[in-house]
UniProtKB/Swiss-Prot annotation:
Has antimicrobial activity against most Gram-positive and Gram-negative bacteria, filamentous fungi and yeasts tested. Has trypanolytic effect on T.b.rhodesiense and limited hemolytic activity against bovine red blood cells. May play an important role in protecting the stored blood in the anterior midgut from microorganisms prior to digestion. Adopts an amphipathic alpha-helical structure only in the presence of an organic solvent that mimics a phospholipid membrane. It is found in: Secreted. One of its GO terms (cellular component) is extracellular region. GO terms for biological process: defense response to bacterium; defense response to fungus; innate immune response; killing of cells of another organism; xenobiotic metabolic process. Transmembrane segments: none annotated. This is Stomoxyn. It comes from Stomoxys calcitrans (Stable fly). It comes from the Eukaryota. The keyword Secreted applies.
Amino acid sequence: MNFYKYLVVLVVLVLCLSATQTEARGFRKHFNKLVKKVKHTISETAHVAKDTAVIAGSGAAVVAATG
């Protein structure tokens, strides 16, 4: 997993350094948008998992109380 992370960082650095300033600026802007989307998706997934755990816990408590 770490290998892929380093590979992505290396590719991004090479692309930014090899491109002209205008292209690099546009690429960085696009890349930052992509990173924000990924972070948002991870955050939403964590919230859904937490909500699911709360619902499952509540259901287990109800079953234990009635059972």
